[in-house]
Structures are given as C-alpha cells and as structure tokens.
Amino acid sequence: MPRGLELLIAQTILQGFDAQYGRFLEVTSGAQQRFEQADWHAVQQAMKNRIHLYDHHVGLVVEQLRCITNGQSTDAAFLLRVKEHYTRLLPDYPRFEIAESFFNSVYCRLFDHRSLTPERLFIFSSQPERRFRTIPRPLAKDFHPDHGWESLLMRVISDLPLRLRWQNKSRDIHYIIRHLTETLGTDNLAESHLQVANELFYRNKAAWLVGKLITPSGTLPFLLPIHQTDDGELFIDTCLTTTAEASIVFGFARSYFMVYAPLPAALVEWLREILPGKTTAELYMAIGCQKHAKTESYREYLVYLQGCNEQFIEAPGIRGMVMLVFTLPGFDRVFKVIKDKFAPQKEMSAAHVRACYQLVKEHDRVGRMADTQEFENFVLEKRHISPALMELLLQEAAEKITDLGEQIVIRHLYIERRMVPLNIWLEQVEGQQLRDAIEEYGNAIRQLAAANIFPGDMLFKNFGVTRHGRVVFYDYDEICYMTEVNFRDIPPPRYPEDELASEPWYSVSPGDVFPEEFRHWLCADPRIGPLFEEMHADLFRADYWRALQNRIREGHVEDVYAYRRRQRFSVRYGEMLF
C-alpha cells in the first residue's frame, strides 16, 4: 500500500460520517412540518428512514474504501495507522463520540465482524477528557416568574416554533399552574423557575416540550406533551414533573425521539439531570443515536464485567422454544441467542426470527416492545460462564459458537433490557398489584394491536414487568402485522361429541386466530380469570380485533400516551377536549 493512504482512508471515513449525520439532521428537521400537517404516516416512514440511514452510509464508505485500496488486503500495521490518523482528526471534531462508533461500524463491515480488538476499534473513547464536557452552545433558555407564572408560561408557549392555532392557550396555562401548585405548593412555586430546551422533541402524534423545573429543593423534570385536535388546533395534554414519569417517557420500549441535536453529547448531558436513572446508552438511544447507544451499552457491559465476580447464568423464567437467554445476576440486561433447532411447534427459520426483531426495531413500539442491540462475534471469557450455562450453550446453540480455548465467540446475539417475566411477577403479587399487572397486560395488548402489531404468542411468559410496573412484550418470533391475521369466531359444534373430540370440527388455515381460545391460557388461574373478564373480556371477541383491523386499513393512527389516562388534564380537571 502506498504511504499516505492511511490518512486518505481516515478522512474518507470521517467524511462519510459527516454525510450520514447531515442526512440524520435533515430527516429530523422535517419533524415539525410532519407534526403540523398531521401526516402521521409520514412520521412513521421518517422514523424507519432515519434508522436505515446509518447502515446505508456505512455501506457507501465501505465501497469507497474498497475502491481506494483497489481490493487489496490490508495488514494489521496498516489498520493501526489508519486508526491513529482517524484519532488525530477527532480532538476538534464536535461529534467525536459518534464518529468513533461510525469508524467501528465501517471496520466491522469491512472485516465481517472479526478481529474486534481495542487496538483496532474504539472500544473505549479516544477522548475521555472531552466526554460530556459542557459545550458553550446554549441548549436551553431560562424563564423566571418575575410577573407571575401565568406570564412565564405564556412566554414559554409563545416562544415555541409551532405555527398552528391553539385551542385554548389560557386554559392550558391554568391547568399547568394548578398542577404545579398541587405538586410544589404556592410558596415553593413562587421561588422556582424553568429552563426549557430550545428544540421540541417529536414522537408519534405529539411534540414534547422538555424542560427543567428548578425549585429551592432541587431540579425536577418539566414535560409538556402538545397534541392536536381533529380540527388541527394545539393543546397541552398534561404536565409531568417526576423523574419516574420522565423515565417512562424516555423509556427503552418507546420509539426514538426526533429532536434536532447537532451536538448530541451536549443534549445527553443536559438531559441527565432530569433522567438520573438512565444510562448514557439509554439517553443516546432516546434521541435516535441508536448505533452509538450500542457502543455505550457495550462499554457499560465491560465496566460492569470488570467490577463483578459473577458468572453468566441462564435467565430466570420458562425456557424459550426459540431463544436461549442468559444474564449476569446483577446486570440489568439479558443476552439472547437464537437456538440451532426450535421446538417442533415453532415452524420458522432463524432468518425469520431476525426479521421479526428488525421489524420491532423499525416499528412504533408504543412503549410496549423492548428495544434490542444486535451483536455479531460476541466474545465471552469461559471463566465468566457457569458450567450449567456452558453446557446449555453447547447443547442448544453449538453451531453459533466458536471455541478459542479460554474464550468462546457467539456468532450472533441480541442484548435487551432485563425485566421480571410477567408469569413470575403474577405468582408473587396479590391484591392491587395483581390487578394493576392484569390491567397493564391487557393495555399492552390493546396498544400493540392499535399500532398494527399482533404478538402471536400472548402467554404471560413472553412479557416482562419494568421497574416502573409497566408490562412490555419481549418475545418476537411470532410477531406479525394485525392486517395479516384472520380473526375468526369458533363455529358452533355440529354435534355434542364435537366438543369432546381431540381435533377441531372446523377448518383452520395459516393466519387464522380464534380469540375465544385466549381464555384457556389467560384465565386458567382462578386469581386472574375474574380480573381478566372484568377488564379485558373484549379481547376474547373476534369482532373486537376485526374492528381494530378496519381502523388500521382505513389509515387511522391511534394516539399513544406515555402516561396514564388519569393524568390527562381533560380527565383530572373535568373538561373534555373534544
């Protein structure tokens, strides 16, 4: 290879990242127009397009590099010099942290995810002293109640870039003040002020104002979801001011926000104060930088692994028919490997399973489907693996494992947020907690269905409970679009003997689903059955599901709220908005 080629390659990779992030910002900047035009299908398409941008631009750079090197192989020393040149380009680069992840992605694509060592990749950042440093560019604006909170909030709302008419701005302001007074008290509120992010956060059918409520006793989140009426007028649906509420809004089971962030590290650092329970990876994920979030997630895993004496074990819960799931006992993630062979009743391929996981990545997760990070050639030290798990891995996934002596390499796996399996949770709770869990489960099914997702396998074991008590779906191998399912009523038996027969007396075609059958496995527990019948009996009716299908086919996009219905101003304060 000619000398000087290393610098050209480094510059080409960085220019490729510039192009990718420029397109990322371009798609993001269209969020306001899509919101104002109530073009909800364009919102969904833009979300998918933005996710695809990263891999598309990695592919473009890889093709450029193959042309530059004329397809010649490169030795280890050459690659190290490329990384050295790339590192020298980063000290004055504003998005250096994501540029490092882009370099990693290009390397992995070029070398088929092999030889992934700290010398060749940015396993940890090359600029640790710059990470999360305060950046001078102001991200937010302060508002003080010099003339009272009504005047303050009028200024905040008037500062918004939205061009639509407000349904009743004065009413919304009084609702917010009423909520803040109930939360803080009159005296504390008088001594508090707001800091509001310059950019709105767009997701689904809402534009979120995100701010900080700075009080004498500390800083609280200040979140206002802005929606539209059917007539295209704006209204504020609620005001959220607790870290738990904010954590759910920015949760791992929700779609990524569209927020214009030329300096994502600065925004992540600004958000950290109101989302103290979120990791760096989760914050990058929330603002749509999912590939860099994967880098940060892997770093968090390495840091945890270095500081613990634990071994990987099989994850608690009923063993899956398709996925082998393991975890570290104290770590908040699980690792999922597709088995070599599935249970006989699972008539599908590994490629189908991967396609299902990709569908979830790109689809609106409505707060009910866990996000995942996908890894190839994942290295584990054998000393970190319990003997029982090692035996299970070799028994169930041997084709995906390469033995390197003191290490194994797993060819492909997913990492996902760890939750308590719902079936285990239901065994452990009673009273109101049991009722809440069943209500949450039914709501999860409804919200998934309204978003055109049918879970397929609705058993409790395929759902998890988050630390906030939300029920989230996490087993995707049978997932499909609602519009692909044929929901049928079970025909009446022809003869009394039909109901005793081992085979159904009616024909069943691929894609047929009989909601009446859900009762058999969802209501078998006498503690659960009556609750389910009380709250979710309509889920057992085929006409309920067909009505949802009709709404989807007519192009209707349902509202998705990241908070309880009872928190809506229209419910709390009695005035209906429509």
Curated annotation (Swiss-Prot):
Spell out the catalytic residues. Answer: 371
Q: Localized where?
A: Cytoplasm
Which positions does UniProt annotate for ATP binding? Answer: 315-321, 336
GO cellular component entries: cytoplasm
One example of a Gene Ontology biological process annotation: tricarboxylic acid cycle
Q: What is its EC number?
A: 2.7.11.5, 3.1.3.-
Going by the UniProt record, its keywords in alphabetical order are: ATP-binding, Cytoplasm, Glyoxylate bypass, Hydrolase, Kinase, Nucleotide-binding, Protein phosphatase, Serine/threonine-protein kinase, Transferase, Tricarboxylic acid cycle
The cross-references to Pfam families, in alphabetical order and at most eight, read: AceK_kinase, AceK_regulatory
| One GO MF term attached to the UniProt entry | [isocitrate dehydrogenase (NADP+)] kinase activity
Q: Which reaction does it catalyse?
A: L-seryl-[isocitrate dehydrogenase] + ATP = O-phospho-L-seryl-[isocitrate dehydrogenase] + ADP + H(+)
- What domain of life is recorded for the organism? Bacteria
NCBIfam families (alphabetical): PRK02946.1
Describe the function of this protein: Bifunctional enzyme which can phosphorylate or dephosphorylate isocitrate dehydrogenase (IDH) on a specific serine residue. This is a regulatory mechanism which enables bacteria to bypass the Krebs cycle via the glyoxylate shunt in response to the source of carbon. When bacteria are grown on glucose, IDH is fully active and unphosphorylated, but when grown on acetate or ethanol, the activity of IDH declines drastically concomitant with its phosphorylation.
Similarity comment: family membership: Belongs to the AceK family.
Q: What is this protein called?
A: Isocitrate dehydrogenase kinase/phosphatase
User: Which organism is the protein's source?
Assistant: Escherichia coli O139:H28 (strain E24377A / ETEC)
